[in-house]
C-alpha cells in the first residue's frame, strides 16, 4: 500500500509541530499514520511529538539534514525517501504520512517526488502584511494555514485584511486555492484542515473545507 504523503512546511515557531500533534491525535484512530520530522542538527521535533505521545514512538522518525532542511525536501530528498521506504516496510498498511520541515516562504516548498500535497503554515504574529507579500508558500501550497489567530489583537493584525490578501494571492483564475485560519489552543480551524485532507486528498464523502474566515 502506498500512503498519502503530506508535506508540512513553514518558518520556525509558526506552529508546524503543534499542528502535527493535533492532527495525529485527531486522525490516529481513523487512519494508519506516521510522521517524519526534519531538523538541521537535532531531533528536537521528533522528541517533542514523542513526549506528547502524538503517536507510538516507532511511528515518529527524525531526519537530521546537516544543512538547510529545505534541501532535504526539495533538491535532494534522498534521506526522506529512505525514511519513507523504511516506514512503509515496517508498516505495510500505512495510509497517511506527514513530512515536516522548517523553511521560510521562499524555501519551504516540497518536491513532488517526495509528497503528494503540502501545506504551508504562517504565523499571525508576523503581522497582517505577510500574506500580501506572496511567495511560493503563500501562493502555491496546496493549503495555506494562517495560525495563531488569538495573537492578532496583541500585534495589531486585522484578520479581515489577512483574509482578503490571502484570497487575492491564492486566486488562480476562477478558483481560489484553499486556506484556513487556525488557533491550535482552542482547536479553531483544525476541522477544516482535516476536511481538506479527507475531501480533497483522500476523496472521502465529507463536507469540503471552508475557505478563509
UniProtKB/Swiss-Prot annotation:
This is Urease accessory protein UreG. Belongs to the SIMIBI class G3E GTPase family. UreG subfamily. GO terms for biological process: urea catabolic process. Keywords: Chaperone, Cytoplasm, GTP-binding, Nickel insertion, Nucleotide-binding. GO terms for molecular function: GTP binding; GTPase activity; nickel cation binding. Its main location: cytoplasm. The keyword GTP-binding applies. CDD domains: UreG. Homodimer. UreD, UreF and UreG form a complex that acts as a GTP-hydrolysis-dependent molecular chaperone, activating the urease apoprotein by helping to assemble the nickel containing metallocenter of UreC. The UreE protein probably delivers the nickel. It comes from Deinococcus radiodurans (strain ATCC 13939 / DSM 20539 / JCM 16871 / CCUG 27074 / LMG 4051 / NBRC 15346 / NCIMB 9279 / VKM B-1422 / R1). Signal peptide: none annotated. Facilitates the functional incorporation of the urease nickel metallocenter. This process requires GTP hydrolysis, probably effectuated by UreG. PANTHER family: UREASE ACCESSORY PROTEIN G (PTHR31715:SF0). One of its GO terms (cellular component) is cytoplasm. It comes from the Bacteria. It is found in: Cytoplasm.
